[in-house]
């Protein structure tokens, strides 16, 4: 299987790893596209391409901040349990502690870009 490991992505894109306990050498990206999971944050997972890197941008983060904690935790559980390769937060935004809990549980690297 050809692809790029999450470790290579971290190094080439100068990302910070918020989940360093996850072995990113074992996760290989095989899909060149990315996804911004706006609809998935609302609970809609039909036609969700879980092979793509998931990007949490400013709009997605703003929406997450409006959610009640129990709803947010349910959404984080569903998103991270769907076997996505990783999550990337853009513009230096920090992931929620509850999200990091689920990322660690399901082995999903959570990365942060300063750009």
What are these regions (language model features)?
Residues 95-99:
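Short, well-ordered alpha-helical microsegments
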Residues 85:
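Short acidic/polar active-site loop segments enriched in Thr and Asp
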Residues 106-115:
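Long, charge-dense
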Residues 92:
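Acidic-aromatic/histidine active-site loop/patch
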Residues 1-80:
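Gly/Thr-rich phosphate-binding loop signature of adenosyl cofactor/nucleotide-binding cores
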């Amino acid at each position: 299987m050809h692809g790029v490991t999450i470790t290579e992505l971290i190094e080439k894109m100068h990302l910070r790893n918020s989940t360093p306990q996850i072995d990113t050498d074992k996760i290989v990206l095989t899909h060149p596209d990315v996804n911004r999971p706006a609809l998935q944050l609302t609970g809609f997972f039909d036609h969700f391409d879980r092979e793509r890197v998931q990007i949490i941008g400013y709009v997605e983060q703003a929406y997450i901040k409006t959610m009640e904690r129990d709803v947010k935790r349910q959404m984080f559980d569903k998103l991270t349990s769907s076997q996505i390769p990783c999550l990337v937060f853009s513009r230096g935004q920090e992931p929620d502690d509850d999200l990091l809990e689920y990322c660690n549980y399901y082995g999903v690297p959570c990365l942060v870009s300063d750009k």
